[in-house]
Amino acid sequence: MARPIADLIHFNSTTVTASGDVYYGPGGGTGIGPIARPIEHGLDSSTENGWQEFESYADVGVDPRRYVPLQVKEKRREIELQFRDAEKKLEASVQAELDKADAALGPAKNLAPLDVINRSLTIVGNALQQKNQKLLLNQKKITSLGAKNFLTRTAEEIGEQAVREGNINGPEAYMRFLDREMEGLTAAYNVKLFTEAISSLQIRMNTLTAAKASIEAAAANKAREQAAAEAKRKAEEQARQQAAIRAANTYAMPANGSVVATAAGRGLIQVAQGAASLAQAISDAIAVLGRVLASAPSVMAVGFASLTYSSRTAEQWQDQTPDSVRYALGMDAAKLGLPPSVNLNAVAKASGTVDLPMRLTNEARGNTTTLSVVSTDGVSVPKAVPVRMAAYNATTGLYEVTVPSTTAEAPPLILTWTPASPPGNQNPSSTTPVVPKPVPVYEGATLTPVKATPETYPGVITLPEDLIIGFPADSGIKPIYVMFRDPRDVPGAATGKGQPVSGNWLGAASQGEGAPIPSQIADKLRGKTFKNWRDFREQFWIAVANDPELSKQFNPGSLAVMRDGGAPYVRESEQAGGRIKIEIHHKVRVADGGGVYNMGNLVAVTPKRHIEIHKGGK
């Protein structure tokens, strides 16, 4: 008697579980915030399926073409239901898995938005890598099982092939075939689940990437705005500094032909007895010098004014330190002998010079500076004076000249003249006329005219910078001679190393280039700041007098003078007129950029040799 079907075919339950790793953004959404965490998902067919042992369906009167497909259909349905359930829970599983991964990294509340996104991108990237690996494993599984389309195969097709396999290779082959079919179906559904998980993760990755790009773009825009603002600030600051430097180095004068002294960046220096008295004092000095030279030609100087600093009367905004006050004096160049026929424009274009029989000089002594007219001989006092042409600046309404500095660290000098009216080619009716500001008065210094008294100049004169300024023909302004403060009267620090000396140091002072500054003296003076050239010179000779070796080379008379800051005497054959002491010579002229206090630029020479050097003698 045939057994019931239930006794012949039975099913053990097939366990299907969820597994997988997925990531998403904040709270399952797409914004920036606490990001989601991974969940393991996928179908697992590793448990035994419990297929009915195969003997011979014919022996029990069962048609395998009918009942095997029923068994397969039931198995496939169970797997499909598990897949559908896992698919419904996919997004929640993805979110939970991402939340778990994020929590493992600790709180993100103190992180910047960009750091939160970068952290999220790392988590999602890791999840994508894991899912792609599992997707690949399931795809390989399908390939190993014959690369069939397990999702579309019919139960009848599977049953027929399973029975055929069993009839040929026995019951175990039959059950292995059905196991492989279910493994393949499970792998196929896993491929779908992992593909969907990867798609979900990729959406999150794209969202986070876009958010990162937005934050970075905003940061870049902010950085550009800040850079532009900083560049603008620096440009404005530089413009202010340049304007301040320009103002501090501008000598402003009226263009009325009067004799005026002006302090750079401050204004006109007041004259104790009025401007007319200063002009008269210069005229008297020139006349006295002319009479003296007519009877006994030589290098003579005639003082005409003294400049004193009176900080007690200076305004608070004005610099009250005499050492830092730079000044210039301007006067009619014709009074110093400028030939009326000279073409100043042509000379200036050629960067040339014009010889003058007289020039101005100044010498600081303590808090007072003496201004003098000095005769020129081409040797002790050069005749050549550089020429510059002034140009009208329609923006400022001033005539201006810019004089490049002779040293790299110093800014250029700017001279301005305020005309009584615009030049002839400027039509005041066509535009709003520029009204220049009146030149202010500097109350921190006073010029006092003195009686003209001639004296033989006691040395080779290192003249301050001076210029002859020409003006356009339509300006109505006569050529002006301008003398600047002697650069040797400007404070400075000693530099240079000097040279080692031995034997009779000043023996070289009467020949060749002269005697170098001894290195041991340079070591003592280097780095010290001196009020002016006179201050340096005095400290130099005091240092020499106190040197145990060098002091042995001088007689008691010279040593006494040197200890008071004076220079030692020279023998009669090396004297020149009233010049009887050792002199210090700048190898490169100060006017040519030679350092005033650069001890490598200084040599000690006798008066006779000094004159020969200036004559070009070897």
Curated annotation (Swiss-Prot):
Per UniProt, which keywords does this protein have? Antibiotic, Antimicrobial, Bacteriocin, Endonuclease, Hydrolase, Nuclease
InterPro entries attached to this UniProt entry: Colicin/pyocin_DNase_dom_sf (IPR037146), His-Me_finger_sf (IPR044925), HNH_nuc (IPR003615), Pyocin_killer (IPR003060), Pyosin/cloacin_T_dom (IPR016128), Pyosin/cloacin_T_dom_sf (IPR036302)
Q: Which Pfam families match?
A: Col-Pyo_DNase (PF21431), Pyocin_S (PF06958)
Q: GO biological process: what's one of them?
A: cytolysis
What Gene Ontology molecular-function terms does this entry list?
Answer: endonuclease activity; signaling receptor binding
Q: Top EC class per UniProt?
A: hydrolase
User: According to the UniProt entry, what is the EC number of this protein?
Assistant: 3.1.-.-
Question: Main role?
Answer: Causes breakdown of chromosomal DNA as well as complete inhibition of lipid synthesis in sensitive cells.
Additional comments on file? Pyocins contain N-terminal receptor-binding domain, translocation domain and C-terminal DNase domain.
Q: Which family does it belong to?
A: Belongs to the colicin/pyosin nuclease family.
On assembly, the entry states: Purified pyocin S1 makes up a complex of the two (large and small) proteins. The large protein, but not the pyocin complex, shows in vitro DNase activity.
Q: What is this protein called?
A: Pyocin-S1
Q: Gene of origin?
A: pys1
